[in-house]
Structures are given as C-alpha cells and as structure tokens.
UniProtKB/Swiss-Prot annotation:
Primary role: Possibly involved in calcium regulation of YOP expression, which includes the export process.
Intrachain S-S bonds: none
Signal sequence segment: none
Origin organism lineage: Bacteria, Pseudomonadati, Pseudomonadota, Gammaproteobacteria, Enterobacterales
One GO CC term on file: extracellular region
Major localisation: secreted
Protein name: Virulence-associated V antigen
SUPFAM superfamilies: Virulence-associated V antigen (SSF103388)
Subcellular localization: Secreted
Amino acid sequence: MIRAYEQNPQHFIEDLENVRVEQLTGHGSSVLEELVQLVKDKNIDISIKYDPRKDSEVFANRVITDDIELLRKILAYFLPEDAILKGGHYDNQLQNGIKRVKEFLESSPNTQWELRAFMAVMHFSLTADRIDDDILKVIVDSMNHHGDARSKLREELAELTAELKIYSVIQAEINKHLSSSGTINIHDKSINLMDKNLYGYTDEEIFKASAEYKILEKMPQTTIQVDGSEKKIVSIKDFLGSENKRTGALGNLKNSYSYNKDNNELSHFATTSSDKSRPLNDLVSQKTTQLSDITSRFNSAIEALNRFIQKYDSVMQRLLDDTSGK
C-alpha cells in the first residue's frame, strides 16, 4: 500500500522507493517514457518540502527529480493503464487528459514544484473530463499567474540584493579606513570588487554564476600593475561611477579620500556612498514584502487545489462505497 501524498509526501516517496515500477498502475502506459523525458527537457524540479502547517513529522527537503527512476515511479503512479478498446469513450477521455498533461508541462512558466502541487495539477489535468473544468481552470490559472510573478520577483530581488551586497562591501572598506583615520584609494589601489572572497564564495564557478558577478561584469575595469604584469580589476570607483546598475552613477569621484578632522572628506565620501544605496535598501524591503504576498497567494492556490482533490476523492469514495453496498 502506498500512503497518500497529500497527507505525508515523505511517506509517499518512501513507499514508492520500496516498490518496483512494474507494480504501479501506469507502468505500461504508452506515454510514460515520453513524460519522463518531457520533465527532464523542461528542467522541472519536483521536491518534497516540510510544511509545519500540514506535516506532523519533520523531514528533510529533497529534490526528487534528481532520481530518474523515482520520477518514473511518480509518473507511473498517477498514469492510468492504456485503454483496451482504442477509439472508445474511455480511450478518448484518456487521450484528452494526457494531452492536457503534456500541454501543461510544456507551457507552464513554473519549473519549481512541490510534490503536492505537482501531483494535484497532474491528477486534475488527467481527469478534467470527469470533474468541474471551470473550477480547475480558475485554480490552475491562479497558480500559473502567481508562480510566474513569484519567479520574476525572485530574480529581481536577487539582483537588487546583490547590488546592495556590493555596496556593503564598499562601505565596510570605507569604514575600515575611517576607523584608522587613514586614506582610501578607490582607483588603481582599490580592492578588486571581482574578488569572490569578498562575498563569501570559495568556488570560482559558483561565483561566476552569482547575481553579484552578473552585475560586476557590466562594470568598466581599471588596469593595474601586479608583479610587473597587467591585471584588470573592478575598482570601487569603477562601480560607483558606472551607470550600469540599478542605482546609477555617482559623479565627481576622486581617486582617493583622506581623513582630516577639519575637513573630513573621507567621512563625507562614506555618507555619500551610504546615501546612494539607501533607496536600494528600501526597494529590497518593498520587493521582499511583495514576494511574501505573492508566495502566500501561490500557496493558497495550491491548498485550494488540494482541498478540491480531497473533496472530490471523498465524494467518489462514498459513491463507490454506496455502489458496492448494493
């Protein structure tokens, strides 16, 4: 017996791992391998995630599409057997359902799915001829809309947060010279903002895939001499003076700023740099709130779909029980 995915996705996955794919209803479906390949080609990630509002037992988050055999079992679990009578009513109903599944996988902007949501959408896409199409369409359209908006907001927030992180690195460097009452060179003796270690990265490839790197690679560069050879860096001046970022360019920059108790240009520079990033900080807070709201709406659509599934299954079970009791 395979426990229901709606109640505990961890138990559902454990049960699937303990059966052979040949034991599942859709193992012989003519479209099983096609759907497996479609999920892979669309880079769809299906994961189980602990939700304290739904799950009584804590379990580790897991991306289950990393395991192709497990993905095959998940698809075989909800796929029905092929119709024996080709061209009949059941066969037509089944083919229409499979067509909807394929269309959904190919057109949905969302590629990150929690198992409950994925199974719910697949189940209803496959069986839509037997339930209320209008209700299903409203719920799934809502999920797609909020899922797409959530993805775009996440990308925008990642870019904003990365730019803010670069400003924080610059501010830390300025503060270091302020505390020592020294001079900061922001040009040819500047720290290299392309240094991955400044942002907590240890792997160069991971850094090059980061939002910080994507911003920095659009900046002008300064050529410096290191051990007799030329090296290009992104200096503090390069970054602050560039238009190629959300906050725009900071004008009238000098190459260096010194501490002076009577006319403290270093302190003024620190304030100017901080003021430049303040609207960005406000925007990050605003976008974070928007993302939280969109995520809440997306989760509400998933919950509505799951409640609809449970109600539908409950009604069908009662009908089956009544029929078998006669």
